[in-house]
Amino acid sequence: MSSLMATLPQVRLSADEISVDVVVYGGTSAGVAAAVQVSRLGHSVTLIEPGSHIGGLTSGGLGFTDSGDKRVIGGVAREFYQRIRRHYDQPSAWVQEKSSDYPRYRPGDDAMWTFEPKVAETVFHQMLKEANVKVLMRERLNRATGVRIAGGRVVSITMESGRIFSGKQFIDTTYEGDLMAAAGVKYTVGREANSVYGETLNGNQVKANVHNHRFLKNVDPWLTPGDPSSGLVAEVENAGPGEDGTGDHRVQAYCFRMCMSRVASNRVPFPKPDNYNERRYELLFRNFEAGDLRVPISPDMMPNGKTDTNNNCAFSTDYLGGNYLYPEASYEKRESIVRDHEDYQKGLMWTLANHPRVPEVVRQHMTQWGLPADEFVDNGNWPHQLYVREARRMVSDYVVTELDCRRTRIAEDSVGLGSYNMDSHNVRRYITADGFVQNEGDVQVSPGGAYLISYKSVIPARGQVTNLSVPVCLSSSHIAYGSIRMEPVFMILGQSTATAAVQAIRANKALQDLPYAALREQLVKDGQVLDLPPGLKKQELITKASLKGLVLDDSDAKLSGTWTSSTSSAKYVGTGYLHDGDVEKGQKSLRWELTAVATGDHELRLAYSSHSNRASNVPVTVSVNGSVSDLIINQKKQPSQDGLFCSLGTYNLKTDDKIVVTISNKDTDGYVVVDALQLLPSK
């Protein structure tokens, strides 16, 4: 492979052809970081952006950074946030409020992680200008015939305008992976089944939907309530819940990370779309009328009285099901999908502020907000970037999965770290067995700390093109991508792939043959963080399938009261465990129901993680065919079975005997923790 570059055909350049060392396609935050890094390493680079703005989501409304563990954000990414802080160090930056009134501005901090969209774009432009990066806007790849490949390498890419960009290396930093796909690189769309990569949080996820983003009240889905023959209201799929863990084509929902203002002098009322249709919001009205009075948005405050506004609750800014075709759609179809999302969200905001079927208390709350007059001034104060949370994902020789996020597998060729929750937004609304509406797809599980991202996951597999890297639509499962897909990580990977591209040029090697040691040395020199923070190490993954006997996880239990999921402890079954928060004593309980599958003596075991803050007097009730045993478990004490399970006793069972185990937090003197239940035949 190393001789391929030397044998590339020499092509004479026309007036419409630009030749550089590295072509970066996609002006996202990753694209900016990649282009800046190439130039700083002394090589020529062109950054091509299909739209009219650079920065992607970072300059498109996502100003409340999903940063995770900030210790693992280094290099160009950290420099960006340091520049943000320096901007807000200037008194002139504070126009609508005083810096002292904004709690997330702390002059002594190394960096600042919240910012206004226009400030982010300005900082990106400054970085590009200082690095002498040539930026070309409004140039879209000819996806049908625009990628020229020779000898297993991308030679040039042609835009719809006819302009040609040739290079020695190419980096696809789009959210959609258009260059990757057009170059014939293998990819996937949708959710894999858990069985594909040995995961627990992928695919269809009904049981995991225990957070805010669901219906808390019974809401009828039929046009005429109670009458299925009348048809469904808008935004509901005519299907049941499905089987957990099965894969499908669905994509987690998109929205606009809307910037709002409540400063009267800088506030524009929410516009009513010309094609407004109140029937799109029938579920919203019915949910309010059922008694759910939560304001269905999540506005996080940024400087100068503005927000980064995200989805929240049962029916909100996420447009479930409206994006399934987007990843592979034509440009024209994508534009239609974006307009549909814009109409949906603008209509939602106008509805919340104005419609008479919205409770007055909600309307009063919403009328204090509007769009900021000084943001997105060329787009009606509306964000120019749809939040494409996930589109195509490359399939390479290394696929980052839940195993990596949980550190049960640790990559040996790190080019950056992730640390945010494995976070999938809902993908659809279905009809429950009881005939009501519910959301599906929401998963929010902490990986329990930072994890390493493999170099092999940002380059194509061997046998595919040898000079294209993909730091955004990288090789990852759906649920792992839910953690990786944060803007700081995209910048980190953009810098790392740019460094690899430069080293491949200098060494005259394919990206797949690049020595990792040299790459690592340069990345560390340039401030990248490549190792786990102190105290983090490889974890043990314990699944139900890996344990003997009949095992029920906490997700299999019936809950009373509000329990909190956690992964803070080092050892647990499945995706985590539950705890009572050491609050609301006597108001929380958990109940498992199981049936014996064999006759004979069986030991019943309870899994929990011990700690000094745990309760010493957890009440557990075991009922076998109505015969009740009351137990007290000291969870300060480490479980005797593998440090994970404690015995709840041995019981003589017959096939089909009914067993009920109930755990309560009544009168407990610390945290009550519940992980799993195991029924084992006695030896």
Locate the predicted segments by residue.
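Conserved beta-strand-loop-beta-strand element in the redox core of flavoprotein oxidoreductases
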Residues: 146-164
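Extreme N-terminal leader/targeting segments of oxidoreductases
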Residues: 1-22, 41, 137
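Extracytoplasmic
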Residues: 541-683
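N-terminal Rossmann-like FAD-binding beta1-loop-alpha1 element of flavoenzymes
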Residues: 22-43
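Ligand-binding pocket scaffold of soluble enzyme catalytic domains
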Residues: 20, 30, 59, 140-142, ...
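Extracellular/periplasmic catalytic domains that process cell-envelope and extracellular macromolecules
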Residues: 16-17, 39-41, 150, 247-251, ...
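Flavin (FAD/FMN)-binding glycine-rich loop and adjacent Rossmann-like elements that form
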Residues: 121, 155, 163-169, 173-544
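Conserved N-terminal/central alpha/beta ligand/cofactor-binding core
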Residues: 43-44, 49-146, 188, 196-198, ...
